[in-house]
Amino acid sequence: MSLLIFLLLALILLSLMAGLLRRLPWLAGLVVALGLGWLAWGLWRAPLEGNIEMLGRTLMQNLPNQLLNFSFQLTPAIRAPILLLLFWGSLFALAAALLKTERILFPAIPILLAALILFLGSAPLLWAPLWLMLAAVIMAFIAQGNQPRSARAALRVLLAPILAFPFFLFAAWVFSQSAVAADDPRLWNNAWKALIVGMLILTSPVPLHGWITALGESSSAFAGAFLVGVWQIAIYTFLRRLLFTYPAITDFADPGLWLPWIAVIQMLWAGAFMFGSQRLGQLWGYLLLWMYGAAFLAWGLTGELGSEAVFWLFLVTPLVLTLTAAGLQSIAHRFGENPAYEKLHGASERMPLSTLGFIAGGIFLLGWPLGALFPMRLATFQVAEYRAGNIFLWAMLALALGVLGVIRAARRLTSPLQDVTLEREPAIAAWTIGVLLAAGGVIALNPGLLSPIAQQLLIWFNML
């Protein structure tokens, strides 16, 4: 049996176990968190060459698997993003179990990770977005949840992969017909343009990724944060493979030029709407969009030289996201999902740690000092100032608008108590947020703590 098949079967089994334990969501979340953590630990320790032993079975690592004319292989290059996905899944499952979030999240996390692993390990490369559409369908179920709510987020999550896939399909057809394309240079040029358009769609021009903002208003806090994070890891990996496989893309449109502008437009869009937000969920959605753009801005400005920093970012971001989502989830339990600002009276008095978690997590995501992401955000802005002055100025404006948006929400959360029957935050929520705050503080004081892990992931990732 190949290691890839074992990994997929283990994820499916975890999903089934979580489904059977749906009446005990805390136990289902704990099982998923431990299972994903065990898989991540086993994959981290596994050597690159030769067979490995897991659960008494001999697993072949680089053995390709065939399905529907696709080839799937767990190469060293995709080991790094798979480890990141497993880490994100384990952390979010554990935090969501402690905070009593929606039950559908726990069986859906392993299935979504399995679909994303198929997407990352599939060949031919230009057909891989077909599996991304499958992952998007699963993401839609997670976004909708098991409560009656608007279907905006669930429907919008399907938009980008469905629109991007035909462009990759056209490019794949032209590249497979090289003899025909050689006689028609326009066809060849159109194929490269189609490939670039597909990349543009997946790197999220704002109108096509309204699902990110809709997640804040129409999904649970943990579901929104998890979906945005794992999507970005998968897209980053796919686009990097594209650039290595088809380096001629840079002759038509250099990503080092257009990617930073797309990212800063997202940040500006998000910052402006964060400043004008009237609901807590709305602020959360635009905060996720700002974070998404900031990660691609870091990659676009630094290119391959910043790959280690990008991996460090993907290691630290889930800690800050779970902190913010935990605070928001606890507040939503008392004030309802996506509460309006005018209803948040007394939140800081009755739920001090939940309020602190949301406010601190929000400004830490923006890169505020004392936060775990401060070193990365500072480095990104310094590179922008050195390499692209215009982008730096727009990024500073986006940052200022985002900070003002969080401050507006903080003023509402700290308003005087009006309803004396408002319950206090659960002790488990307070302890969870406290631990996450402490973990973020440790990383902020010692940013190099995770550097060895990021370096090892980069070594594997460079084995393309």
Please give the residue ranges for each predicted region.
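Transmembrane helix-loop-helix hairpins at membrane boundaries of multipass inner-membrane proteins
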Residues: M1-F6, I12-L98, F106-P107, I453-M463
